[in-house]
């Protein structure tokens, strides 16, 4: 799989800014595997094959199992995800689909139960970046 545009070559400053954001997010204490699940779920919703290919490899490198990756699009019914992961996935879906609905208060409240304010900002920035 290849991207249509080589963003690093076409806009190196913008690419470096995104790398800076990624570095910041990874320094906020969120688990690497959680971040990859979030990126994969947003990519599933967005139908981005290139992103799914890249982030499934990154998720495996972060310790994710094949079974959890295969069932990610059915995470609500699958028993393999923790309450924290479920809160992150619900937050990811709500933000990714924000044009269709506002983020429900219940989704926000559940996310706040599992994530500090700093972690939720990092999670939000991850979703914003993958959706950009």
Language-model regions, residue ranges each:
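Hydrophobic alpha-helical segments
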Residues: 1-132
């Amino acid at each position: 799989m290849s991207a249509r545009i080589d963003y690093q070559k076409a806009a190196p400053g913008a690419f470096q800014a995104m790398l800076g954001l990624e570095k910041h997010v990874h320094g906020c204490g969120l688990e690497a595997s959680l971040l990859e699940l979030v990126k994969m779920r947003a990519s599933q919703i967005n139908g981005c094959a290139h992103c799914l290919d890249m982030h499934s490899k990154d998720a495996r490198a972060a310790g994710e199992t094949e079974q959890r990756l295969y069932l990610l699009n059915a995470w609500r019914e699958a028993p393999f995800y923790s309450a924290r992961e479920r809160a992150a996935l619900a937050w990811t879906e709500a933000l990714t689909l924000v044009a269709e609905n506002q983020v429900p208060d219940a989704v926000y409240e559940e996310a706040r139960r599992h994530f500090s304010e700093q972690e939720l900002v990092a999670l939000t920035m991850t979703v914003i970046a993958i959706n950009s």
